[in-house]
Each structure stands twice: as structure tokens, then as C-alpha cells.
Amino acid sequence: MRLVLVGPPGAGKGTQAQLIASHLHVPKISTGDIFRKNVADDTPLGRLAKQYMDAGDLVPDEVTIAMVRDRLAGDDVRDGFLLDGFPRTVHQAVELDAMLAEAGARLDVVLELVVDDDEVIRRLSGRRTCADCAHVWHVTYDPPTVDGVCDLCGGKLFQREDDREETVRHRLEVYYQQTAPLIDYYAARGILEGIDAMGPVEEVTARAVAALRHWSR
């Protein structure tokens, strides 16, 4: 099965991507992993991407698409894959369709993790990170014994800039602006499946797996 997983920040996409891919026995492919491997292996694409990242710029679509194309040529994806973090735009989606068509394949389904904005804000703005060991706690879901102090090492806990409520709200706005056309694109093709991402991790995974049974027939 070939699928794409999309969802807003705080939807648990990384966790679900790993669990769903494991259930399907297909590789989880994330753009972050692809970037890191290309940079670590000092490939021509990795060197090019690093130039942009070091300058604080976004890696151009052409470089990202080329990296994904290389990855999808691997032997381990012949029976399927789960893409996490790609495509992000309609342009990238069209390029992905073209890549797969060249190989005589197609995308089977796009899973969209659907979660309430207020829940995303609760999940992310409640996170506290240890300044010493970098362990992440949560003021509601996984609080330390002593407020502001890490149970593991006694380090001071702080709130990352990315986890501040106003930053989270802005990230959500950007996500919806960028992703709405992509969601419409896949909905028009009839391969979009919404998954309720509220509740415990294992319940969300169970919903996704149940939905995928329909698409694997």
C-alpha cells in the first residue's frame, strides 16, 4: 500500500506514521529523514540542501522533489510506503503522482489526521522541556513531581518558543493556508480519508488501521 499522512502540528503525526507503517510492514519515509541522510552521506543533493538550511532558507521544491524521487527508487518501497511530510503543496503532489506513474504505480490513500485546534494548543503549549537533559514533560498529561523541575535530572523546565500559544496559533494558520489546497486536491481525486486524531495514541492508530482495511481491498 502507498499512502501519505497529513495533519496539523500537534496531531501526533510522527508517532502515528511510525505505528501505521509498522502495521502495514512498509517503510516510513519522512522528508526530515531524507534530508538528514543526504546531508550525512554528503550527496550532491545533500550538499545543495545544506547550503539553503545553513543560510536559514527553505530548501527549494526542486531539491526536495529530487530527494524524494531518489528515495522512492529504493528496493524497499516496491510493496508500498508511508510518506510523512511530503507532499506539502499541490505542486509537490502533482510531482509525486508523476513519479509513481513513471513506475506504473499510484497513490492508494491519503490519511488526514483531524484534531480540534483547541486540543492542538493544549498539547503543544503545555509542553515543558528540561534545559539539561532535554526530556519533554507536559503540565497536564505528563507533569513532573515538582512544578518546573525535571524528575529525571533535576534540571529546570522551560517552554520552547515553538510551544508558546501565540506561536502555535500562527503555526496552525500557516498549516491550514498551505494544506487546504492539498486536501482539496486529494478529496477531488476521491482518495482522502479523515481520521479522528483525538484521544489516546492507540485508539487513533486503531481508527486508522480500520479505515485502511477499506482501501486495501
Swiss-Prot record:
Q: For the region NMP, what residue ranges are annotated?
A: 30-59
Please give the chief subcellular localization of this protein. cytoplasm
**InterPro entries linked to this entry:** Adenyl_kin_sub, Adenylat/UMP-CMP_kin, Adenylat_kinase_CS, Adenylate_kinase_lid-dom, P-loop_NTPase
- Which residues of the sequence carry a binding annotation for ATP? 10-15, 127, 199
Reaction(s) the record says it catalyses: AMP + ATP = 2 ADP
Asked whether the keyword ATP-binding is assigned, the reply is: yes
On whether Oxidoreductase is a keyword of this UniProt record, the answer is no
The UniProt keyword set, sorted, is: ATP-binding, Cytoplasm, Kinase, Metal-binding, Nucleotide biosynthesis, Nucleotide-binding, Transferase, Zinc
Q: Offer one example of a GO biological process linked to this entry.
A: AMP salvage
Q: Give the start-end ranges of region LID.
A: 126-163
Q: Which residues are AMP-binding?
A: 31, 36, 57-59, 85-88, 92, 160, 171
**Where is the protein found, in the record's own terms?**
Cytoplasm
Q: Name one Pfam family in it.
A: ADK_lid
**Gene Ontology molecular function: any one:** ATP binding
Question: So what EC number does this one have?
Answer: 2.7.4.3
Domains as described in the record: Consists of three domains, a large central CORE domain and two small peripheral domains, NMPbind and LID, which undergo movements during catalysis. The LID domain closes over the site of phosphoryl transfer upon ATP binding. Assembling and dissambling the active center during each catalytic cycle provides an effective means to prevent ATP hydrolysis. Some bacteria have evolved a zinc-coordinating structure that stabilizes the LID domain.
What function is annotated for this protein? Catalyzes the reversible transfer of the terminal phosphate group between ATP and AMP. Plays an important role in cellular energy homeostasis and in adenine nucleotide metabolism.
Quaternary data? Monomer.
- Which family does the similarity line name? Belongs to the adenylate kinase family.
This chain belongs to the protein called Adenylate kinase
- Origin species: Acidothermus cellulolyticus (strain ATCC 43068 / DSM 8971 / 11B)
Gene name of the encoded protein: adk
